[in-house]
């Protein structure tokens, strides 16, 4: 009996050893899971949406294989709103290694302890994303290294740089028909309330963005007084910092009194504007449905590019004198992410040549600088050698990232052929950015602001009637949006060929 047991044990051990050997031979392939905005990375598509080359994701996988000898796979999915993205993560229905939220949602995710940290310190930057250390714009770096958010779970307050790596950035302003709208009128948020342009303007169907418009309108006198005070100052760095900090504070006032004032202002605005929108405004202005579109900079570029191609209307871009928002989207790693793989991918994304590809594909402005980005914007916007133009100093963005041969007297100066259009939507001057503040999360006043937004959107319509009405509109809107997307897909790509 003992002999049989002994033989059985030997047999089991032999099987186990063979099994281990087989398992070692079957090496598992790592998978990177990425969750991003729609049309927010170069997917290797042509103007008709057909696959013509490798996507950025595929190029990274090939590059990873070349460097490490290991295969890697990826899953790439998209979302349309921050709210939807956050709900997916919180329900646990999907797991991702990298997500690209807006700045105020980065704050929200930090505060709720939803994110992994990057290996980062103030002196040396990102240990495993050196390309961002080398080529990240000093302007964008300063924002992420200056702003802090409190993690409510750990009671630790750290800068955004510990949790996020910037991707794209831009401003909020107005795209407008230059033949029908006066520049002085569109240079103020008041244009949304201006009866001269009744039913000709749109506002964003986004509580954060439209709240800023309301606050800027409510506190216009205070903002213009600040502007005059700054203009009369010596414009020292201390003066500049104070001016920007005050604008940021005003646009992020969420006290009960301000919420009430903004609610009244937005309800009044509804009587004068064409309607709320998120994506349709950039096409409505092309067809003449509206003449003023409250827009993000990247969408403004799309509208102006398309208008130039079609030749039906000349569009411009203006950032209101009172001030506006400068926004940033950044890459964060949800808890449980494959940090090593995520950081490797981001280091690839922060190469200037890859950043230029993405920027050329989607129309928004990359947070990466460097020679390739400088060459790209010169191809797009600079005058020829024998032409006169408008010199613009972009040292605030490119300082320390481009070679000496591109500098003029030590400065990153580009001479552009026109102002107030695509170039200014992508690269506003340092002076303009002084009056642009960063949007903050609503924090403890979140419920109060959302209630205000419901009141603005619903008006006098009864609750359940409004819900039913909205459901009908949503179904119709999805169908219409799908048709628009099909019709306009081939025009979504920038028409510049160098990096496509």
Description of each model-found segment:
Residues 25-112:
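Early extracytoplasmic/lumenal segment of secretory-pathway proteins
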Residues 203, 210, 214, 222-315:
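Ligand-binding pocket segment of bilobal, Venus flytrap-like solute-binding proteins
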Residues 329, 334-426, 476-478:
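Mature extracytoplasmic/periplasmic domains
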Residues 117-129, 164-165, 310-325, 334:
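Short beta-strand->loop
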Residues 191-207:
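Short loop->beta-strand "edge-of-pocket" segments that line small-molecule binding or catalytic clefts
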Residues 18-21:
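C-terminal motif of bacterial Sec signal peptides marking the signal peptidase cleavage site
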Residues 71, 77-86, 107-169, 183-187:
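Hinge/lid segment of periplasmic solute-binding proteins
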Residues 404-500:
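Conserved C-terminal helix/tail region of periplasmic/extracytoplasmic solute-binding proteins
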């Amino acid at each position: 009996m003992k002999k049989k047991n002994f033989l059985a044990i030997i047999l089991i051990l032999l099987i186990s050893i063979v099994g281990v050997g087989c398992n070692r031979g079957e090496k598992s392939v790592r998978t990177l899971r990425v969750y991003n905005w729609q049309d927010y990375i170069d997917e290797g598509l042509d103007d008709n949406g057909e696959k013509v080359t490798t996507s950025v994701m595929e190029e990274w996988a090939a590059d990873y294989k070349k460097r490490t000898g290991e295969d890697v796979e990826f899953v790439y999915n998209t979302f349309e709103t921050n709210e939807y993205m956050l709900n997916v993560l919180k329900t646990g229905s999907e797991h991702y290694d990298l997500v690209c939220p807006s700045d105020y949602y980065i704050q929200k995710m930090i505060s709720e302890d939803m994110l992994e940290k990057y290996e980062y310190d103030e002196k040396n930057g990102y240990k495993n994303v050196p390309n961002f250390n080398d080529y990240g714009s000093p302007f964008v770096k300063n924002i992420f290294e200056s702003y802090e958010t409190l993690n409510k779970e750990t009671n630790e307050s750290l800068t955004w740089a510990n949790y996020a790596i910037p991707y794209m950035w831009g401003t909020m302003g107005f795209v407008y028909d230059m033949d029908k709208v006066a520049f002085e009128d569109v240079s103020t948020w008041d244009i949304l309330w201006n009866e001269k342009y009744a039913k000709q303007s749109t506002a964003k169907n986004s509580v954060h963005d439209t709240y800023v418009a309301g606050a800027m309108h409510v506190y216009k006198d205070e903002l213009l007084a600040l502007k005059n005070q700054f203009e009369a100052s010596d414009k020292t760095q201390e003066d500049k910092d104070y001016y920007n900090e005050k604008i940021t504070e005003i646009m992020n006032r969420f006290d009960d009194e301000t919420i009430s004032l903004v609610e009244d202002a937005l309800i009044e605005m509804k009587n004068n504007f064409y309607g709320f929108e998120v994506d349709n405004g950039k096409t409505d202005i092309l067809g003449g449905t509206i003449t003023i579109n409250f827009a993000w900079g990247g969408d403004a570029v799309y509208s102006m590019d398309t208008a130039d191609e079609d030749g039906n209307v000349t569009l411009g871009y203006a950032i209101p004198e009172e001030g506006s928002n400068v926004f940033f989207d950044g890459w964060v790693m949800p808890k449980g992410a494959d940090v090593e793989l995520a950081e490797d991918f981001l280091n690839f994304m922060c190469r200037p040549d890859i950043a230029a590809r993405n920027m050329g594909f989607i129309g928004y402005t990359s947070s990466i600088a460097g020679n390739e980005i400088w060459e790209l914007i010169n191809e797009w916007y600079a005058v020829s050698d024998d032409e006169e133009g408008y010199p613009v100093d972009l040292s605030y963005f490119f300082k320390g990232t481009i070679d000496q041969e591109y500098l003029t007297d030590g400065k990153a100066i580009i001479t552009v052929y026109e102002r107030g259009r695509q170039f200014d939507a992508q690269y506003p001057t340092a002076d303009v950015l002084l009056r642009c503040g960063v949007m903050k999360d609503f924090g403890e006043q979140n419920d109060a602001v959302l209630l205000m937004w419901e009141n603005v959107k619903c008006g006098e319509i009864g609750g359940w009637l409004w819900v039913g009405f909205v459901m009908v509109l949503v179904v119709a809107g999805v169908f219409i949006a799908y048709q628009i997307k099909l019709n306009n897909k081939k025009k979504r790509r920038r028409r510049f060929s160098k990096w496509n």
